[in-house]
Amino acid sequence: MNKRKLNAVMQLHGESQQNLADFLEMSLSRLNAKINEYRGAQFRQNEIAAIQEHYGLTAEEVNEIFFASFVSQKDSNGPAA
């Protein structure tokens, strides 16, 4: 899950996480759990499709956000000092 890219898409459309939570008809805390993959929480296929349509995302953008393995700069440079 590339939460930075999802947040960038939301900002580009002038929306907050609360706006997306309302659109998906879920609580903000549940949305945050899915974005942060807290305790294995993940977006369902229908939620990903709804987000894709809502923001007009391409299939490639959906893959980059939800399916591509994302390594932060800190992680790729080894352990934090």
Residue ranges, per PLM feature:
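Hydrophobic micro-packing sites on short alpha-helices
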Residues: 47-52
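Recognition helix of helix-turn-helix/homeodomain-like DNA-binding domains
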Residues: 26-42
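Alpha-helix N-cap/N′ positions at the starts of helices
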Residues: 1-2, 43-46
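Short, charged recognition helix plus adjacent turn
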Residues: 8, 14, 33, 41, ...
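A short, Lys/Arg-rich alpha-helix, primarily the initiator
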Residues: 1-19, 23
